[in-house]
Amino acid sequence: DILAVYWLQKAVSNGETEAAQVLNRIAIRAKPASWAKTALQFLTRESVSSHPFLAARIELAAVFGLSRPEALLLDIHSADKGHCLLVDIREHYRRSKRKLILIQTGRERQTLSRIGRLFEKVDCGPNGPEGNYRQRQYRLKTLLPAPVPEHPEDTVS
């Protein structure tokens, strides 16, 4: 389906309306996650420098509309497919569903490339510097001064 998204995007750029309908069924468009946009407002220069990976994950969620589990567990290396973002955290979070998010703007591409460079030589798994899911959740909760509610549209279905 990743390759299909690529070719469907090509067809849409050539004016194929049927391809656009099929593309909308198998991939979603990026829309900001409200919890992450709120969380970005609480990030200070000190918190970004002390937790650069967490700050990058929050920014990624703000741009692509990731839920908290998706943002905290996403393997950045394998998620970037060039034309889309593959969000598949089922190995670590059983309740999640695999999804493809289209990369449509230059800003989305730049953000993903910059964050990809940050994570370039980093193990994104539980043995890496970020720790396991619980450690990442704790760090997120302690980094933000007040509880940032996750709205129903941001949750993993």
Listing of model-derived features with the role each one plays in the protein:
Residues 20, 30-68:
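Basic, Lys/Arg- and aromatic-enriched nucleic-acid-binding interface segment
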Residues 26-43, 95-107:
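DNA breakage-rejoining catalytic core of tyrosine-based enzymes
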Residues 104-157:
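Active-site/catalytic core of tyrosine-dependent DNA strand-transfer enzymes
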